[in-house]
């Protein structure tokens, strides 16, 4: 028997898993978007346009007003941020059942929502994006608490507060220039809004907002990339080993020898009702073993029809084979004397 191998199936599964892990490691964090009127990029010529690639992450942040931070506006602004398609974003309209990303309604907390650009999301409520498609993030309220529920116009029209996401594209049609990962803020969540005020706990309220810690001077430094890459590589090797072990077990089972159980053929049975089970060397008849039983399925003469025609035809179709024996006419046993 040759050495076990995982086979082509195990290699393909391992390669797909490795590619998935490498994709998670290779994604970059884009420059965060601070959502208030103090962000001058909303008034830039051509609008606020980003070119994310599949695997990247983007932070949306609502800066606090109390105490004021480096990105705070003079007065706190209340917004709901929606993810819409290209046509709706150009009209500054959200659908009746909008895809809500983040609600900015807590003046004393920094709130954050992280978007993961992925084609397939493992989360039921996760967002999915297609490469070479355009998406918009818009705010249709007017900045006041009373206008939060508006689904049309708002600051999207009056102040140009919308972000165009050109997924998988580039402004020059080539490779997209990216900043090093060390200059980007660390991603703290998987598609949930976060409070970034240090020393504060989660507060009840909107389900899109959860609290986490963040320094007043900016985002925390990212984790060590060699450590992340090493952990991802170890996970990939573990998954490859599991796939290889499974393939080896399947290969060994295929190579296993067939069962050595022996079933006698129909010719081993005698005529006249004798099943040929007698022992040799003068020994008496022995008991039949499982699989050696002959079953007579016909009558004694040619005129007698078979009393079990079905099993005569398909006797080998169910489990262990059943051997069909043509029974002869009944005979008196020889050498038997009767005492009178």
From Swiss-Prot:
Disulfide bonds: 62-104, 92-156
Composition bias type Gly residues, residue spans: 267-284
Organism: Homo sapiens
Region ranges (Disordered): 168-225, 254-298
Domain Ephrin RBD: residue ranges: 28-167
Entry's Gene Ontology cellular component terms: glutamatergic synapse; hippocampal mossy fiber to CA3 synapse; plasma membrane; presynaptic membrane
Entry comment describing in which tissues the protein is expressed: Highly expressed in brain; expressed in embryonic floor plate, roof plate and hindbrain segments.
Protein name: Ephrin-B3
Family matches, as Gene3D superfamilies: Cupredoxins - blue copper proteins
Quaternary structure, from the entry: Interacts with GRIP1 and GRIP2. (Microbial infection) Interacts with nipah virus and hendra virus glycoprotein.
């Amino acid at each position: 028997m040759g050495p076990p191998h995982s086979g082509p199936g195990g290699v393909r599964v391992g390669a797909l898993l490795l590619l998935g892990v490498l994709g998670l490691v290779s994604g970059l964090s884009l420059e965060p978007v601070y959502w208030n009127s103090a962000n001058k990029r909303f008034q830039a010529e051509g609008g606020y346009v980003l070119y994310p690639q599949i695997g990247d992450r983007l932070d949306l942040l609502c800066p606090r007003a109390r105490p004021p931070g480096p990105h705070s506006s003079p007065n706190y602004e209340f917004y709901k941020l929606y993810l819409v398609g290209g046509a709706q974003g150009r009209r500054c309209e959200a659908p009746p059942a909008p895809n809500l990303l983040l609600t900015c309604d807590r003046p004393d907390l920094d709130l954050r929502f992280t978007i993961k650009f992925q084609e397939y999301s493992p989360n039921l409520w996760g967002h999915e994006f297609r490469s070479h498609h355009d998406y918009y993030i818009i705010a249709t309220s007017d900045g006041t608490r009373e206008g939060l529920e508006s689904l049309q116009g708002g600051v999207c029209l009056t102040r140009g507060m919308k972000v165009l996401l050109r997924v998988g594209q580039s402004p020059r049609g080539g490779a997209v220039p990216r900043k090093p990962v060390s200059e980007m803020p660390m991603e703290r969540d998987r598609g949930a809004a976060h409070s970034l005020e240090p020393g504060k706990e989660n507060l009840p309220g909107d389900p899109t907002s959860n609290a986490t810690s963040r320094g007043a001077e900016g985002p925390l430094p990212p984790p060590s990339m060699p450590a992340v890459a090493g952990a991802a590589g170890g996970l990939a090797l573990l998954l490859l080993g599991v796939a290889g072990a499974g393939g080896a077990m399947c290969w060994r089972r295929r190579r296993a020898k067939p069962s050595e159980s022996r079933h006698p053929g129909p010719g081993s049975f005698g005529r006249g009702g004798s099943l040929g089970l007698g022992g040799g060397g003068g020994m008496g008849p022995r008991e039949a073993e499982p699989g050696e039983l002959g079953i007579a399925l016909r009558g004694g003469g040619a005129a007698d029809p078979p009393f079990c025609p079905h099993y005569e035809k398909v006797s080998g179709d169910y489990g262990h084979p059943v051997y069909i024996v043509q029974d002869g006419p009944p005979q008196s046993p020889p050498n038997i004397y009767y005492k009178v």
